[in-house]
Amino acid sequence: MIKDITLGQYFPGNSAIHRLDPRTKLLGMIVYIVIVFLVTKTPVFIIPALFAAICIYLARVPLGYVIRSLKPIRFLLVFMFIVNLFMVRTGKTVIAFWIISITDEAIKQSVYITLRLVLLLVGTSLMTLTTTPIALTDGLERLLMPLSKIHFPAHELAMMMTIALRFIPTLIEEADKIMKAQMARGADFESGNLIKRARNMIPILVPLFVSAFRRADELAMAMESRCYHGGEGRTRMNVLKFGRGDGVAAAAFAVLTALTIAAQKLIP
């Protein structure tokens, strides 16, 4: 399960999506998230889903690689679906047994929550798969740069994001090594129910946390030895510039927004 996590990993390529300015991707991701949460009718979910599928095709990222990112949260998806079945009480009762009652509105909301989580994870994974952590950080820093006039720590926030994204694949690799070492000693992480499998993961957490703190300490010492003092006087090898592709992407997101709003109003 751990090796299936693709968040923070970069898939090398030279596709149209890879070449987009990271600021375009970040702003587009915000628009995409808003659109996904604006959808309140089942047929309208086809629009953001189709848009994500087109982006995956243009990015030339293997579909299996994107779908693999859903495996680690499959239990969360099932859990959220079941919880919403019993949390929503409005609507017409379709299933009633003892003290349990499930309404049509509860089923609809459960489906909506599940679809939103899937679409959001696919979109987020696609953004990290097609953007290097450094480019993503530079884009975020440039977007937040106007806030530095009111002493907002734009560079520090961007640096924290870079380190976090960079360490995700490292910690995944470290956890995989620890699991293999534990399995060589007879540990079993695959069999048993969900609670038993979660309990079996405890021996992995302690050495993983120790390794994470050790790596963080080594990184801090390396940054101090290189006289790192934040973003003051920092220059960049690659200066971010908007291109023709970014204009096309902005138009595509505008069309996506217009289609979604129109479908929401026209579809009963």
Model-identified regions with their sequence ranges:
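Membrane-helix interfacial "entry" motifs
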Residues: 14, 37, 61-65, 97, ...
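Transmembrane alpha-helix interface motif
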Residues: 1-44, 48-57, 142-152, 156-159, ...
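Transmembrane helix-loop junctions in multipass membrane proteins, especially transporters and channels
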Residues: 41, 45, 60-64, 88-96, ...
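Alpha-helical transmembrane segments and their helix-start/interface "positive-inside/aromatic belt" motifs
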Residues: 25, 64-74, 249
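Juxtamembrane/interface alpha-helical elements of multi-pass membrane proteins
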Residues: 73-187, 194
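Loop-to-transmembrane-helix entry motif
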Residues: 69-77, 114, 118-121, 202, ...
